[in-house]
Amino acid sequence: MNEIGLSLDTVWMLLAAMLVFWMQPGFALCEAGFTRSKNTANILMKNFVDFMFGSLLFFFLGFGFMFGSEGAGFIGMPNWGDLSFYKGDLPVEGFLIFETVFCATSATIVSGAMAERTKFSMYVIYSAAISLFIYPIEGHWTWGGGWLCNDAADSFMMSTFGDVFHDFAGSAIVHSVGGVLALIGAIALGPRVGKYDEKGNSKAIPGHSLTLASLGVFILWLGWFGFNPGSQLAASGEVNRIAISHVFLTTNLAAAAGGVATMFLTWLKYGKPSLSLTLNGVLAGLVGITAGCDLVSPWGAVIIGLVCGIVLVYAIEFIDHKLHIDDPVGASSVHGVCGILGTIMTGLLSVSNGAFYGHGWGFFGAECFGVLVIDLWAAACGVVLFFGIKKLHGLRVDKRIEEEGLDVYEHGEMCYN
């Protein structure tokens, strides 16, 4: 590769990393807006924890666990902060930063589902565990060259499905993992005080600022233009410039379709279009398209967005009203359900090897198997982590602290005075 092309690719990767980093304040504002004002400082602090601890731990060990060895292994070799093992064309420091912001995204998804009742000290522990072990290990199976993406003729995936698992930017690897962990964490915590009456009926606990939540979603939408197109990791040459342009388009179309689908469904279902659910509908479309944004057509992206936007509404209702799991921001539905759904639909709608384009069911099977394995890993880790913390030290704050707000009791300060 010539120097100019490699330099352009490096600059694009770093710009994309900056956009993905910008998703952190997007998540922070979205979560803060969907929760009550007495917990805002706690929400913001947890989002800082995700990136601060994630940056250090992923540099020290997580990067090695994810990329430290090639082949069909379970986990890469630890690097202990030594980056010399990496042999790619792009500068290793830049690639590390790009992967770090993805790792932090997976960790921060969990925060919203466990909002308003989690001990801050325990949040630090499980945020660190996600960045150090949970995300890097399943990341090694996929983006790290592990067994789910091993395309050797005699590999398990090729001999079983005739194709490998594909997740271009992380519908499963990042989002469904975060969503499954969020669901397990919310189950371990239990619902907020006053969320369900004595008959088990769900009672709405409105957030304090749809303005903040709306701004957060707009910022996330912007950040996704680094999250998905940036995963091409190149911008030089005709192939790459066409690829990132295509991914930009499919990403935007899915987001718009998800929001439109949710808006009209809530209008029909509840008599009025819901802003809060429409915001989550946009995110549902973004999460859903992330796996196959490089493989599906623009119309395929619209279909994925529409389906995710519709399914989102029923998923939130089912988790809240039927399962009685209290997820204040809908993270388990947006990232978990729609991450899984988007990955599966990639197996159907991929132009190059999807079942609906006459290429057989092998790739669809690979997508279903891959997301199943990844999320079973996340669920198993979540059960051990959250229920282990709950038994050993306690995961939840006292009732009085929850009722009066975590800001003062956990941090000694409030966002609003």
Spell out what each predicted region is.
Residues 1-417:
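Glycine- and aromatic-enriched membrane alpha-helices
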